[in-house]
From Swiss-Prot:
Its EC number is 6.3.5.3, 3.5.1.2. It is found in: Cytoplasm. Keywords: ATP-binding, Cytoplasm, Glutamine amidotransferase, Hydrolase, Ligase, Nucleotide-binding, Purine biosynthesis. One of its GO terms (molecular function) is phosphoribosylformylglycinamidine synthase activity. It comes from the Archaea. Pfam families: GATase_5. The active site is at residues 85, 192, 194. It comes from Methanothermobacter thermautotrophicus (strain ATCC 29096 / DSM 1053 / JCM 10044 / NBRC 100330 / Delta H). InterPro entries: Class_I_gatase-like (IPR029062), PRibForGlyAmidine_synth_PurQ (IPR010075). Residues 2-218 form the Glutamine amidotransferase type-1 domain. Part of the FGAM synthase complex composed of 1 PurL, 1 PurQ and 2 PurS subunits. GO terms for cellular component: cytoplasm. Pathway: Purine metabolism; IMP biosynthesis via de novo pathway; 5-amino-1-(5-phospho-D-ribosyl)imidazole from N(2)-formyl-N(1)-(5-phospho-D-ribosyl)glycinamide: step 1/2. This is Phosphoribosylformylglycinamidine synthase subunit PurQ.
Amino acid sequence: MRVGVIRFPGSNCDRDVHHVLELAGAEPEYVWWNQRNLDHLDAVVIPGGFSYGDYLRAGAIAAITPVMDAVRELVREEKPVLGICNGAQILAEVGLVPGVFTVNEHPKFNCQWTELRVKTTRTPFTGLFKKDEVIRMPVAHAEGRYYHDNISEVWENDQVVLQFHGENPNGSLDGITGVCDESGLVCAVMPHPERASEEILGSVDGFKFFRGILKFRG
Ligand SMILES: NC(=O)CC[C@H](N)C(=O)O
């Protein structure tokens, strides 16, 4: 299965994601910000980092690059798309997932392990978890506070993917830190599953996000 890993100037989790996709048994390949056609791919991951230095707002400039038009086309073709951290911010900026990720309640970069609850298992990335399972993954961001004007709609549509369990380190509304589109195929998560995918890192909970992509394709 061919999975694209999108690179922007300032991406910094691209190699980690590529590595973990290989461990999961996928055939990952890097894709640059100016690529206009991703038809040959079966799925795409937008990794974390500081695309374009987080100028204006995290994700704002990456959102207007040619590759994001190609991602929209993949979504129309019903192929899975996962955005992690800066990737999640980009997916929110282009409107492929509901709501926004904005400046943390305590407005500084925050890096720590978190406990999370998996709120829906209908996405390709969470299909290997049990609903309401508690997992551990780290967060590392300055602009990760989730907000939506009409949060009840997001809950009612089963679009909440991850919720902080216990401590809510950035002040996200309802502790939400992962959301998906209505189909469930486009998923944006602020915590880093690729940093929780090998025993040596302290958790393997995140690995299921990547194995789930392969399982989804059957
Ligand atoms: N780890 C990351 O992807 C960082 C996300 C983003 N640049 C922020 O600080 O909010």
